[in-house]
Amino acid sequence: WECQIPGAEAGMMYKYKIYGADGSCIDHCDPYGFYSELRPNNASIIYDTTDYHFTDSEWMKKRSVQKDAPLNIYEIHFGSWRKKDDKDAEGWYTYREMADLLIPYLNENGYNYVELMPLSEHPCDESWGYQNTGFFAPTSRYGTPDDLRYFVNACHKHKIGVLMDFVPVHFAVDAYALWNYDGSALYEYPNQDVGYSEWGSCNFMHSRGEVRSFLQSAAAYWLSEYHFDGLRMDAVSNLIYWQGNEARGVNNLAVSFIQNMNQGLKDRFPTAILMAEDSSSYPGVTRSVHDGGLGFDYKWDMGWMNDTLNYFRTAPEYRSENYHKLTFSMMYYYSEAYVLPLSHDEVVHGKATIIQKMSGDYEEKFPQALVMYMYMYAHPGKKLNFMGNEIAQFREWDEKRQQDWDILKFPKHREFHRFMMELNEVYEKHSAFWEADYAQDGFRWIDCHQEEKCIYAFERKSKKERIVAVFHFGNTKEQEYVMKISGVKKLKLICSSDDSEMKKAHPEYQKDLPVKKGAVSIHLPAYS
């Protein structure tokens, strides 16, 4: 059914008064509303979505899902990247103001995509946007829907792609929103066993056609009306398995929902990126739906992330026992199209920040973090880093506070940031780091049997170049590490975590390292 209300105009607030089957009478926001009041208020607001005109037609025409191209993603929380010095207000920058601040930073630092934690309307700041009430409404915390369109348009103007996190698994339990909408379980499961998620939110009932249509429409809306370049689907393992628990079995109807949604999105938006945050080992996440897969373009490699961080937490004298943690990823790597994520989830809830996770004292943490990032960028797979990682922030992320930009006044952090900028530049410049990410001939182990010395060596290849990556994760110097390499007469140094020591040890090799009789001798400082 539908009705028309004479005199309704843009800017007016409204709610639906629902008389429930259980005898309740509750005022609800519009599930399909385009704009909302700022929390704690929750009325929907009539909004004219036809006023804004994008000027990014060239970008939209040329964009594509290029797995043979660099993809370097900077993940941010919109409200805490930077804050205004205004003690009487929230301190948020608007969508338009953030365009002027964030875009130059992304360009200067060498990131070509930004991923925004959920911007769909949500009542609780502490949920970070992952417990939604408005699946079609950008949060009013940072401005209007047209302000968000301005932000995306500005990013495209400066050749920055924009991804947004989308949450198709669950929704907030607030009574004014989707919960018990008509006095019964309308959007959610009626039974308690699967009705609520591990976060206390309501699980969507993906077996209902109306719920499927609602979520598929919402996903398409962000791509169509806001020109987002892709969506990162949150908590996919909680869709695949009942309550995210493999022991409870596959939720076949939710799996078919994912397939239908992804296929529909690909049919309408073939050049948009679909990315899965999935911690399970369910097969075929990035295989096409036609071939029986889930239809995502990329999947986060949570296994690589966990193994890598666990390795660098380990004291150097015990790393030989965990040597395999940095070789195991290549045992399964080609089963999916992976992104290597060091995301917001790794720097909260007492887990410690990336720099804090490194073994050793303050002085030892920095070189280890640098060489860990070099390993990340040399390893096959696209890259994702959360804000603050690039400046070696020691304080865990807090959505109420901006990043600790003041630490850049300290030489260690300033040099770390400079190196990360250089690393991003090296990554983008050299095709061997990204052209053959998902081709088995794009990677080859040279040496993965140096357990006692904590040395790893491998080769990355593209049509134009070969790059050899050598890592020493031990805390002692290796004066003459001999590495076998065939088919070349010399190696040119393109990047080192410690140029000064390398050049001091081999002043004659500042440009080239000679290969003699199929081998090269290299001085490896600690953590290099």
Predicted segment positions?
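Feature representing long, continuous alpha-helical segments
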Residues: 209, 213, 217, 259, ...
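Conserved alpha/beta catalytic core and glycan-binding cleft of carbohydrate-active enzymes
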Residues: 40, 227-229, 244-400, 428, ...
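Carbohydrate-interacting/catalytic domains
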Residues: 1-70, 95-106, 363-366, 379-385, ...
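Substrate-binding/active-site clefts of carbohydrate-active enzymes
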Residues: 37, 60-68, 77-228, 232-250, ...
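Non-transmembrane alpha-helical segments in soluble domains
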Residues: 103, 107, 152, 219-223, ...
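Short, contiguous acidic/charged loop-to-helix segments that flank catalytic cores in large enzymes
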Residues: 135, 139-143, 206, 248-250, ...
